Amino acid sequence: MAAPFDAFFATARPGPLGQRLCIWHAPHDGSAPKSLIVFIHGFAEEMNKSRRMAALQSRAFAAAGHAVLQMDLLGCGDSAGDFGDATWQDWIDDVVDAVRIARARHTQSWPGAAQPALWLWGHRMGCLLATAAAPRIEGGCNFLFWQPTPNGKAVLQQFLRLETAAALMGKAPPAGRPSAKDGLAAGSGVEVAGYRLSPGLAHGLEAARLAPPASGANRRMEWLDVAPQAQDAASPVAQQVLTTWGSAGWSARHRSIVGPMFWQTTEIEDAPDLIATSSSALTSGAVRLGSPCFVDTAVAA
């Protein structure tokens, strides 16, 4: 029987920055998993705020018969390197490596069992990384998106605003030092809210889009949004993205869940309805495979 939970360091690539912290969740009953899920965390402090929710969801998936791999990206959490060491391409490579590690762990745990369907489960910025890495993943994948951002430019702008917020609170940078935006434009690394940001990460993030991979036939994309109050429908921006995915052959579905926006709350909070909806999304038969686009907004109570 496979160990239900295991934390370990894996070598993503050679060199001093190659070690990645991984957490493996196997199906609780020890059977071969229904699917293989790789979690891709959010950006900077959003990752830290979401640690608990990611762990709770991973355990829920394992209890439902799925296998999950969580991996800290380069410079994040307990993986090698500092945040400022990472580029956008490094993180894309990490997602590809995480899939390789997860598949190898599956083969080791259940020799002879066929590789199950693969899901890339992203949170916020992690959704952008998932779509960027997908063309390099053999056999294709499905997507589970938690509060995805349609483009990385918005993520970067929101992060850089933290510098302005700090200045308003009397924590302005030293006189004569360029703003973070100007520093990045000049090709220099900058520090914002305690995080060192490299130009290679900032520029790659800024150019990222939530674009559908080409191989969409018989593939699924589940988009789950969380809001404090019930939402009648997906936002116009989300609807446009969903339509684009549907036109590319993906079966795309949106659902809105009532709950706290845990990745930005002051205190660590849980969104139990998001966990329940995510677990059901992987097995729900409501998605019509091959349809241009199916948008089903269901608000959890």
Residues covered by each model-derived region:
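The alpha/beta-hydrolase serine catalytic core
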Residues: 137-275, 279
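Active-site signature of alpha/beta-hydrolase-fold catalytic machinery across serine-
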Residues: 132-136
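Short glycine-enriched, charge-decorated loop/helix-capping segments at active-site entrances
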Residues: 53-54, 82-88, 268-269
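N-terminal cap/lid segment of alpha/beta-hydrolase-fold proteins
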Residues: 1-35, 297-298
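Short beta-to-alpha linker loops that shape the active-site pocket of alpha/beta-hydrolase fold enzymes
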Residues: 43, 67, 72-77, 149, ...
